[in-house]
């Protein structure tokens, strides 16, 4: 059963969904169950995928990887998400953008998640 804020991907068409309200049935796309994208469960290099959380004046700066992640046409970060105080904040990226996002929020505990088009879903907590 899908749970709140889990991310799922269709292995056929590539549709990706984030669960806003978990119901009682599995998610299906193209006639088959969608794959749950578990954070950090692929073979991507950790130093290029695990979000780095930095508390800065006015909010949080999230950088993807301790070594900057490529942002090329065939390999890029699709989005960066910050979870804090029961809220979700998302910045969508495209090839050529910097693999980082600033979120102007005041929270003491946050979780940062990102999605790489080749290596899936990754997260870090402060």
Swiss-Prot record:
CC cofactor: Fe(3+); Cu(2+)
Metal-binding keyword on record: yes
Annotated positions binding Fe cation 2: 49, 69, 75, 116, 119
InterPro entries, sorted: Desulfoferrodoxin_Fe-bd_dom, Desulfoferrodoxin_Fe-bd_dom_sf, Desulfoferrodoxin_N, Desulfoferrodoxin_N_sf, Desulfoferrodoxin_rbo, Desulfoferrodoxin_SOR
One Pfam family matching this protein: Desulfoferrod_N
Keywords: Detoxification, Electron transport, Iron, Metal-binding, Oxidoreductase, Transport
Group of enzyme by EC: oxidoreductase
GO molecular function annotations of the record: iron ion binding; superoxide reductase activity
Record-linked PANTHER family: SUPEROXIDE REDUCTASE-RELATED (PTHR36541:SF1)
Other comment: Catalysis occurs at center II. Fe(2+) ion of center II is the electron donor and is converted to the Fe(3+) form during the reaction.
Family in the record: Belongs to the desulfoferrodoxin family.
Classification via NCBIfam families: desulf_FeS4, dfx_rbo, neela_ferrous
Protein name, as recorded: Desulfoferrodoxin
Originating organism: Desulfovibrio desulfuricans (strain ATCC 27774 / DSM 6949 / MB)
Gene of this entry: dfx
């Amino acid at each position: 059963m899908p749970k709140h804020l889990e991310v799922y991907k269709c292995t056929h068409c590539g549709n990706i969904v984030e669960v806003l309200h978990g119901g009682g049935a599995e998610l299906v796309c193209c006639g088959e169950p969608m794959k749950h994208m578990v954070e950090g469960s692929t073979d991507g290099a950790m130093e290029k995928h695990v979000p780095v959380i930095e508390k800065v004046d006015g909010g949080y700066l999230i950088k993807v990887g301790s070594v900057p992640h490529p942002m090329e046409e065939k390999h890029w970060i699709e989005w960066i998400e910050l979870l804090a105080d029961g809220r979700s904040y998302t910045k969508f990226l495209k090839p050529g953008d910097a693999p980082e996002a600033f979120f102007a929020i005041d929270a003491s505990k946050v979780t940062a998640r990102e999605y790489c088009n080749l290596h899936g879903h990754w997260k870090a907590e402060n």
